[in-house]
């Protein structure tokens, strides 16, 4: 954690597979441009079967978790994130966010994709709160699974607390069960972006 020369706290590169990251905390990660340092990054060139369990990611300048993929490098392996917490991402513990002209980082809690590519990622029994942007976002991935998760008071950047989105022309294969989203009445966040097909008695 810490330091403007750092990128992600923990990042998988060169297609690692079958790793378990357990009971770790990642915070105060920041790159020189203040827009690309995540707490945990299983993105771009990450292989199959990697898992995060019991981890906490907070106060990273970019995202708590970033599972970004892009067409140049292709799809990444399926990632499971279970019993984890993401909060207060988008600024550092040492930042004075009240200073004139302060610029937040992107600040998503759980960013679960990118590039309109499939990932099959799973978010299970996780909590996301107080993040500058979205608490949970598919970030264009069309087939993530969200089970028994809670998002609270995210979206201080006039964003969604939860956002499931991809191209209109793509088949949406999201699976959502037991998802709770709450915000304080004075928060500027937009209404959650969740397709009607995912609404139900337990969401």
Where are these regions (language model features)?
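Feature marks extracellular polysaccharide-active and adherence modules
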Residues: 1, 22, 27, 43-45, ...
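Extracellular beta-strand/beta-solenoid scaffold signature
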Residues: 1-14, 31-46, 59-73, 94-115, ...
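Small-residue (G/S/T/A) turn/hinge positions that recur once per unit in extracellular repeat modules
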Residues: 16, 46-47, 76, 142, ...
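Short coil/loop residues immediately preceding or within conserved phosphate-binding loops
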Residues: 16, 47, 52, 118, ...
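Extended non-membrane alpha-helical scaffolds
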Residues: 74-78, 83-88, 100, 105, ...
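Short, solvent-exposed beta-strand-terminating loops
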Residues: 91
